[in-house]
């Protein structure tokens, strides 16, 4: 069975996920955003929101994979590198976290100078 969502339904899931996150319910946000991304894996805003929810829920391994996916699709987005750094910190990989954070700072400085 093939399930598809209209653009409006996708935005509804995204906004509800974001609202759950803002209300401090990161786990609920992940459930809604997982549903959105199961049906539309390329939804960038959904992936970014899920990444923040995963970090808030201390799910470092999933967050690291999500951040790496986002970086592979948008390597110049500084926030992706900051989230990768935080995920690696949660996973106890401090050397990688420092490297990712350094990359974040370089991109941030570069973007501010434009």
Curated annotation (Swiss-Prot):
Q: Which gene holds the coding sequence for this protein?
A: yscY
Please indicate if the UniProt record lists Chaperone as a keyword.
yes
Origin superkingdom: Bacteria
Q: Where in the cell is it found?
A: Cytoplasm
Quaternary structure (record): Binds to YscX.
List, alphabetically, the GO terms of the cellular component aspect: cytoplasm
Which InterPro entries does this chain map to?
T3SS_YscY, TPR-like_helical_dom_sf
Key words, A-Z: Chaperone, Cytoplasm, Plasmid
Listed name of the protein: Chaperone protein YscY
Record's function text:
Required for Yop secretion. Functions probably as a chaperone which stabilizes YscX within the cell, before its secretion.
């Amino acid at each position: 069975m093939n399930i598809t969502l209209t653009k409006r339904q996708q935005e509804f899931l995204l906004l509800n996920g974001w609202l759950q996150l803002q209300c401090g319910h990161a786990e609920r946000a992940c459930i809604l955003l997982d549903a959105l991304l199961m049906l539309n894996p390329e939804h960038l805003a959904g992936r970014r929101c899920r990444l923040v929810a995963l970090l808030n829920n201390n799910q470092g391994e999933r967050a690291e994979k999500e951040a790496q996916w986002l970086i592979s699709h948008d390597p110049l987005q500084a926030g992706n590198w900051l989230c990768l750094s935080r995920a690696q910190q949660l996973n106890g990989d401090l050397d990688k976290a420092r490297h990712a954070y350094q990359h974040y700072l370089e991109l941030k400085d570069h973007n501010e100078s434009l």
